[in-house]
Curated annotation (Swiss-Prot):
Biased composition (Basic and acidic residues): 63-74
Single GO term (MF): L-glutamate N-acetyltransferase activity
Any single Pfam family the record assigns to this protein: NAT
GO CC field: mitochondrial matrix
Regulation: Inhibited by arginine.
Name listed for the protein in its UniProt record: Amino-acid acetyltransferase, mitochondrial
InterPro entries registered for this protein in UniProt: GlcNAc_Synth_fun, Vertebrate-like_GNAT_dom
Taxonomic source organism: Neurospora crassa (strain ATCC 24698 / 74-OR23-1A / CBS 708.71 / DSM 1257 / FGSC 987)
Keywords, in A-Z order: Acyltransferase, Amino-acid biosynthesis, Mitochondrion, Transferase, Transit peptide
Length: 712
């Protein structure tokens, strides 16, 4: 029934074309209402595919109809200047607008946003022109573009009583500060594709302030650098101008360079650049314009414009929009403190994203030796990644240095530090997305290569996932396209040539301020090993562990109360360690279990102690957001138990799909309600290990206060 409803909604889109502006699928200010009505109502994956196929199939049909109508106008003598126009738009602009809208809807549908994602998007971007303002007449039973209001307002989508939202005219706009590196090296197809994506972000409520970075040009004369910047600015303006109004504006007088060094709080990065003319940014943003900022700054000493570092401009803009830019006097900081104490907002805009579009893509993975970091928890991973990149910029022990590797590592290092500096100025829910122009433009290289390759070259290509635009996907879901805890085999397309397979992997990195990760005992000091019997070991009652908060985490995550006394007694002699994310927002308890029929001494001597994930918990408010589950899981499989771990879950547990994607294997245990998972590479080929794993997963006693419910 639901699939049929979605298909009828899709048909309503096609049939409603004639009721909108010429050739457009979307009326003015309706983009977000449309998106939420159709694509964010928690459609299943199959329904999403049905919608995508429906949109794609109607494109060719509409083009044929328009061609027939145009032919009639040219051939029939009755269709003269005074004859009524056909209901089909005939201009190339109208067709382009319609096709562009259709592509936009498909890209949104491909984001696979869930109910939780939809609620998060609404909470951030809901108070927009696309939503009903207070005092306006409520829509009739026929919604936007013929979609019934009963479908658009399904109870499964909006929980609780719907309230009309009053939109304030002085509401701060949602902004993405975007850096385009080396645009002079992009061809027109890439640039236009990126421009299209940025206008789509605008349609979804996120305005871009674009900073050009042309530092790869090393001219002999300063004038040629200025010519290059001017040329690239004009190219970008033309590209954005192809995709509707309001058009982009150049802000060439807003960034200033100071020769003085004002005393600023330590939490604000030191920067010679600042926004000297704020209205040059705030006024056009209030009118919905995308802004383009050339890498130039006005010096208050020389009274001239000169070259400026693009990263410094990004930091200056972020500081300004966040309301953290102040003058030279200490009184400015006292005024800030007064505003904060009075609850006044001093932000000029809400910076939700910082986007870096770089030909090199995201940050390379330092753990796997190839591929790209999918997600970076800066609070926990920044130093290790920075050290790995810095090492590549230095000469080897033999005194040699690969210039190409060093140059790329330097760029990645600058982008990583830019992410760290900007996120330090922004709320914890802000993020930095680093991607390549091809991915930002949604140019599907892997599919194109698949079509061009020989049939026998892609035996496993069907296992690759749907290609999605990483920027649109992240805006709607606040997640990377792929989960960071997925094994590389789940992401990498299979190909006979390993280099070709790696070239098709995603190159987008999502960075967040994230959470600190604490592991007891610390595996960086001593690697976790099966404990010798009788040796003192960690206990959950030790002072380093906040037991009440740990119990609350477990109770909240599982939705039931733990029998604390029984649980402490059960794990007191088997505890391997504990992982804590943030302030007990997520965690894992891991043990060394003894197979049935063996004593601990024998199991230790024979190497048969089983590494077991006893509890994996995430606070409900943190589930599906911020990557808390991925952070905990990564800490477990990379740091705590890198050689493998097993665990069990009820066969009907909804989280089993998540477990399955991250495990090496799964086995439904006969004559029980348990499914067993493991990450140990050699488990399947080791019969004794598999029997021990199964024995432990069958016989672990549950420790819940309510024994009437099935064990978890």
């Amino acid at each position: 029934m639901f699939v049929r409803t979605c298909r009828s909604s899709c048909n309503a889109w096609t049939n409603a074309t004639s009721t909108t502006q010429a050739g457009s699928l979307l009326p003015p200010n309706a983009h977000r209402s449309v998106v939420l009505t159709l694509s964010l109502q928690a459609c299943s994956a199959r329904t999403h595919e049905s919608l995508i196929r429906s949109f794609a199939s109607t494109t060719s049909q509409s083009k044929r109809q328009e061609a027939e109508a145009e032919e009639k106008r040219q051939v029939s003598p009755r269709l003269g200047p005074s004859a009524p126009r056909s209901s089909y738009p005939s201009s190339a602009e109208a067709r382009q607008k319609r096709d562009s809208d259709r592509e936009f809807l498909i890209s949104v549908l491909e984001s696979s946003a869930t109910k939780r994602d939809a609620r998060g998007y609404l909470q951030t971007f809901g108070s927009s022109a696309a939503l009903t303002s207070a005092g306006q007449k409520k829509p009739s039973t026929i919604g936007i573009l013929g979609v019934p209001a009963s479908v658009a307002g399904r109870p499964a989508f909006v929980q609780g009583t719907e309230k009309e939202i009053s939109v304030k005219r002085n509401e701060a706009p949602h902004v993405a500060v975007v850096k385009l590196r080396a645009p002079q090296a992009w061809d027109d197809v890439l640039l236009e594709g990126v421009a299209k994506t940025l206008t789509r972000l605008r349609d979804l409520g996120l305005l871009s302030v674009i900073v050009l970075d042309c530092d790869d040009i090393k001219p002999n004369q300063a004038s040629s650098w200025h010519e290059t910047v001017t040329e690239q600015t004009d190219r970008l303006l033309r590209a954005i101008g192809q995709y509707g109004f309001p058009a982009a504006e150049v802000v060439d007088s807003g960034i200033w360079k100071s020769t003085e060094n004002p005393q600023i709080p330590s939490s604000v990065p030191s920067n010679p650049l600042y926004v000297g003319f704020g209205k040059a940014f705030t006024t056009p943003l209030a009118n919905g314009h995308i802004l383009v900022v050339p890498p130039r700054a006005y010096s208050d000493a020389s009274l001239q414009y000169s070259k400026a570092d693009a990263n410094d401009i990004v930091i200056a803009l972020t500081t300004f929009f966040a309301g953290l830019q102040f003058g030279q006097q200490s009184s400015d900081y006292r005024q800030l403190a007064e505003k904060v104490s009075d609850g006044q907002s001093f932000r000029k805009a809400l910076v939700d994203r910082v986007i870096v579009i770089d030909p090199l893509g995201g940050i390379p993975s330092h753990r796997q030796g190839h591929g790209t970091q999918v997600f970076i928890n800066l609070e926990d991973e920044f130093k290790n990644i920075q050290d790995a990149l810095y090492e590549k910029t230095q000469p080897t022990s033999a005194g040699t240095k690969d210039a190409g590797v060093s140059a790329r590592a330097t760029v990645h290092l600058e982008n990583l530090r830019l992410a760290k500096s900007t996120l330090a100025l922004l709320p914890s829910n802000a993020s930095v997305v680093m991607t390549s122009p091809a991915e930002a433009a949604n140019i599907n290289v892997s599919r194109r290569n698949q079509l061009e390759a020989k049939p026998d070259g892609f035996a496993g290509e069907v296992k690759t996932r749907t290609w999605r635009n990483p920027l649109i996907h992240n805006l709607l879901t606040d997640r990377p396209i792929y989960s960071s805890s997925l094994p590389i085999g789940r992401i990498k397309p299979t190909h006979q040539d390993e280099e070709i397979a790696l070239s098709r992997m995603p190159t987008t990195t999502l960075a967040k301020r994230g959470l600190p990760v604490t592991i007891f005992p610390d595996p960086r000091v001593n690697r976790w090993q099966p404990p010798q019997p009788g040796v003192p070991r960690l206990r959950l009652t030790d002072t380093c562990i906040d037991l009440p908060r740990l119990v609350h985490l477990i109770n909240d995550s599982f939705g039931r109360k733990l029998n604390v006394e029984h649980y402490l007694d059960r794990v007191k002699d088997s505890l391997a360690g504990i992982i804590i994310a943030g302030e007990y927002e997520g965690g894992a308890i891991l043990t060394w279990e003894t197979p049935f029929g063996l004593d601990e001494e024998t199991a230790y001597r024979k190497g048969r102690l089983v590494p077991y994930l006893d509890k994996f918990a995430v606070l409900r408010k943190s589930q599906g957001a911020g990557g808390v589950a991925d952070i905990v899981f990564n800490a477990m499989v990379r740091d705590a138990f890198p050689d493998g771990v097993c665990w069990r879950s009820r066969k009907d547990n909804p989280v089993n799909k998540w477990y399955f994607e991250r495990s090496r294997g799964v086995l439904k245990l006969p004559e029980s309600n348990w499914a067993m998972f493991w990450t140990t590479p050699e488990a399947v080929s080791n019969d004794q290990m598999m029997r021990d794993y199964e024995d432990v997963c069958r016989n672990i006693a549950p420790s819940w206060a309510d024994t009437t419910k099935p064990a978890d």
